Amino acid sequence: MMLEQRERFMEMVKERGLVRGDFTLASGAKSTYFFDLKMVTLSAEGAYLAGRLVFDLLRDRGIDAVGGLTLGADPIVAAVALVSHMEGKPIPAFIVRGEMKEHGTQKAIEGYISQRGSSVAIVEDVITKGGSTLKAIKAVEEAGCQVAKVVALLDRHQGGSDELRRRGYDFTAILHADAAGEISTE
């Protein structure tokens, strides 16, 4: 079942999330293709599949909460929380702000992180160099949490996943892209 869901998710990314053209990525790198996975994760089926695929990786790992840097992680963490509830194994969600809020509670993290020492998973829509992921990791570690797992929906294989592993994080990608933007499940 998970393989069928991964294949369907890959089809959706190819159909809705892959855009060809000239782009500057968040890392500053230039690219002839761009993955706009919000076009997938904000659809009903895509949200379900993303939530299901990530939840299946986190199930039975003792994860206390799942989160990531806004905006790419937002629909993913909500989908994981929903799927986990449907499975009777609720994993609450949190979102790491890109910039510190200067009014109200001035929180760097919104949502649920239970306490210092919590075991959390960080999710990302697309990982390139890893800057956004590392920013989220830094915020949750500064809040006293342990990062037990890092999951990206798609790895562009441009150094980010290698850097996370080099730093000792347990990283998994659902899909992979090569230098030409071709997507695979391996």
Q: Where are the language model's segments positioned?
A:
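Solvent-exposed alpha-helices and their adjacent loops that cap or buttress functional pockets
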Residues: 27, 111-117, 143, 163-164
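Short helix-loop-beta connector
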Residues: 59-64, 114-117
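Short, glycine/charge-rich flexible loops or terminal/linker lids adjacent to PRPP-binding catalytic cores
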Residues: 77-121, 129-134
